[in-house]
Curated annotation (Swiss-Prot):
Gene3D superfamilies, per database record: P-loop containing nucleotide triphosphate hydrolases
Classification via Pfam families: ABC_tran
Lineage: Bacteria, Bacillati, Bacillota, Bacilli, Bacillales
Keyword Translocase on entry: yes
Membrane topology (UniProt): Peripheral membrane protein
Name of the protein: Phosphonates import ATP-binding protein PhnC
Compartment(s): Cell membrane
GO MF term list: ABC-type phosphonate transporter activity; ATP binding; ATP hydrolysis activity
Organism in which the protein naturally occurs: Bacillus cereus (strain ATCC 10987 / NRS 248)
Swiss-Prot/TrEMBL catalytic activity: phosphonate(out) + ATP + H2O = phosphonate(in) + ADP + phosphate + H(+)
InterPro entries in alphabetical order: AAA+_ATPase, ABC_transporter-like_ATP-bd, ABC_transporter-like_CS, ABC_transpr_PhnC, MetN_ABC_transporter-like, P-loop_NTPase
Key word Transcription regulation present: no
Stated role: Part of the ABC transporter complex PhnCDE involved in phosphonates import. Responsible for energy coupling to the transport system.
């Protein structure tokens, strides 16, 4: 379980990124967070693995405080958290296989990984992960030779090879076309269902949130304004999340295109 205890984030300019967040996410959930740009979605997501440090409160993972973790303890906890970015975050000139093997770095010494020395078991796991997202044939291609959708699937394979217990996906389909968007979200959903990996995804599309989530969390101005099951996420609730009915209707139209 992931638990946010009275979590706040204030940026140096005084802007509140998060305002007293109290939230529990159970193991195996597929949670989609929605809200306007600047609502706090990315800040909340990235605070889980401390890519963003919080100003106040505490974040617990399986009963252990990642907020208080340091050194080896922090590295161990981060090893269990896979991160998927909008920009893919791959080493473009490296092969797909090497990018996936980067998910194993936390399990070995710095010297071994710097030299690119991975045991046979890691290679097998990397190949299995690529097969899982239907991109095994690209194992020896350079990452920059792949389409955007293929690169995002490499990111998912990297999280699988990492044997992550939690996957955080920050706007993973924002730059993808509708067909590729479906493929990427289908992969994330199937992995969530097959392996019980807790998955938190930031999305702008209301339609996609309804299609894939088991639970939807709406943020507005750094605060949670909705937290419920998909069937509870009515048009009226989305209007509250996005501020007004006109904004909500516009987003619905974009989502369907």
């Amino acid at each position: 379980m992931i638990e946010f205890r009275n979590v706040s984030k204030v940026y140096p300019n005084g802007t509140k990124g998060l305002n007293h967040i109290n939230l529990k996410i159970q193991k195996g959930e597929f949670v989609v967070m929605v809200g306007l740009s600047g609502a706090g979605k990315s800040t909340l997501l990235r605070s889980v693995n401390r890519l963003h440090e919080i100003t106040e409160g505490e974040i617990m993972i399986e009963g252990e405080s990642i907020t208080a973790a340091k050194g080896k303890g922090l590295r161990r906890m981060r090893r269990d958290i896979g991160m998927i970015f909008q920009s893919f975050n791959l080493v473009k000139r490296s092969t797909v296989l090497k990018n996936v093997l980067a998910g194993r770095v936390g399990y070995h010494s710095t010297l071994r990984t710097t030299l690119g020395i991975f045991p046979k078991e890691d290679l097998e796991l990397a190949f299995q992960s690529l097969k899982r997202v239907n991109i095994l044939e690209k194992a020896y291609a350079r990452a920059d030779e792949l389409s955007g959708g293929q690169q995002q699937r490499v990111s998912i394979a990297r999280a699988l090879a990492q044997e992550a217990k939690i996957i955080l996906a920050d706007e993973p389909v924002a730059s993808l076309d509708p067909l590729t968007t479906k493929q990427v979200l289908d992969d994330l959903k199937k992995i969530n269902e097959d392996f019980g990996i807790t998955t938190i995804v930031n999305l702008h599309s209301i339609d996609l949130a309804r299609q894939y989530a088991t639970r939807i969390i709406g943020l507005h101005a750094g605060e949670i304004v909705f937290d419920g099951l998909v069937e509870e996420a009515t048009d009226e609730k989305f209007a509250e999340i996005y501020g007004d009915v006109a904004q909500k209707s516009e987003l619905l139209e974009v989502a369907v295109k």
